[in-house]
C-alpha cells in the first residue's frame, strides 16, 4: 500500500512562512488532503516539532521531525528524524552553530514557536535561514550521528541548491534527492537554454544527473494553500513504517527502505 508523503514543510517558526501556518494548521490541512506521512522542516530549527507531533498523533498522520538546514555553502538540505527527541537534539545542535545574526521581525518576518493549540510560547532571536558552520560534506555524518537522514533539497532550483551553489549534484550519504519536478531539469547552468522545445517549454532545460539517488518531490509549504501541493508516494504499508501502531513514532529502517524504492535517474555515460 502506498502512503502519500510530504517531507518538506515550514511553519510559523520560519520567517518566510505565514503566521497562519502553525504546526496544527499544517497537520490538519495535510490530513484533510490525504497525506499520511508528513515532515515539519523549518529553517535550522525543530522548536515547533513537539506541537506538530501531538497534532499528527491525534489525526493519525505519521510524523517525521527535523529541519531544512542551510550548509556553509548555502545549500538547503532536509535533515529528518523519526524520533522527536533526536530531532529536538539536532535542532539544539544546529542553533549552536548558526551564524548569530539577530532577526528583525519587521524586516524579515516573525520566528515564533507555539503549542498544539497555536498559543505562542516564544520567539527565536537569531535569523534562522542563515548558514550553519557545517559543510555539505559533513552534514550527512552529523545527522546520522543523531539517528537521522539527509535529503538535498530542491536540487533543480536556481537558489540554495546543490546545482546553484556547486553546479552539480554531488555524491554523499543521501537517503534521496528532492526535486521540484520530475524528471529534474535545471535552467541556471551552462547549456540549460539549449533544450529542443524552445525557451519556456517544460522540456527545455538541462536534464539533471541525480547520480542514481531515489527521487522525491515536496510541497515546500510556507502558506496554508501550499500544503500537499506536491506530495509523492512511499511504497510501504503503514504498519511497517509505524510498527508500534497509530500514535507512535516511525521506524527509521523502514523509512530508508521505502525511500530506496523510489524512482531514480542517472545520465547515461557518453563514453
Where does each model-flagged region fall?
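Charged catalytic cores and adjacent phosphate/nucleic-acid-binding surfaces used
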Residues: 1-7, 13-35, 46-92, 128, ...
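Short low-complexity stretches enriched in small and charged residues
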Residues: 30-39, 101-110, 128-136, 160
Amino acid at each position: 500500500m502506498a502512503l502519500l508523503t510530504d517531507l518538506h514543510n515550514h511553519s510559523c517558526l520560519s520567517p518566510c512562512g505565514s503566521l497562519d501556518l502553525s504546526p496544527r494548521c499544517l497537520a490538519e490541512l495535510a490530513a484533510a488532503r490525504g497525506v499520511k506521512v508528513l515532515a515539519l522542516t523549518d529553517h535550522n530549527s525543530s522548536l515547533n516539532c513537539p506541537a506538530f507531533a501531538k497534532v499528527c498523533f491525534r489525526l493519525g498522520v505519521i510524523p517525521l521531525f527535523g529541519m531544512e538546514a542551510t550548509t556553509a555553502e548555502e545549500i538547503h538540505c532536509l535533515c529528518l528524524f523519526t524520533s522527536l527527541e533526536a530531532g529536538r537534539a539536532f535542532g539544539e545542535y544546529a542553533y549552536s552553530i548558526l551564524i548569530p545574526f539577530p532577526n528583525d521581525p519587521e524586516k524579515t518576518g516573525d520566528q515564533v514557536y507555539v503549542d498544539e493549540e497555536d498559543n505562542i510560547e516564544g520567539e527565536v532571536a537569531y535569523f534562522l535561514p542563515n548558514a550553519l558552520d557545517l559543510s555539505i560534506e559533513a552534514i550527512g555524518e552529523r545527522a546520522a550521528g543523531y539517528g537521522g537522514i539527509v535529503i538535498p533539497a530542491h536540487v533543480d532550483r536556481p537558489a540554495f541548491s546543490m546545482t546553484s551553489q556547486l553546479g552539480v549534484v554531488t555524491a554523499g550519504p543521501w537517503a534521496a534527492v528532492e526535486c521540484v519536478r520530475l524528471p529534474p531539469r535545471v535552467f541556471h547552468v551552462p547549456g540549460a537554454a539549449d533544450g529542443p522545445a524552445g525557451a519556456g517549454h517544460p522540456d527545455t532545460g538541462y536534464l539533471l544527473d541525480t547520480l542514481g539517488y531515489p527521487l522525491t518531490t515536496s510541497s515546500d509549504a510556507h502558506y496554508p494553500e501550499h500544503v500537499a501541493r506536491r506530495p509523492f508516494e512511499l511504497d510501504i504499508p503503514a504498519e511497517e513504517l509505524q510498527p508500534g501502531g497509530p500514535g507512535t513514532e516511525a521506524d527509521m529502517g523502514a523509512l530508508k527502505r521505502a525511500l530506496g524504492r523510489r524512482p531514480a535517474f542517472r545520465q547515461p555515460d557518453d563514453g
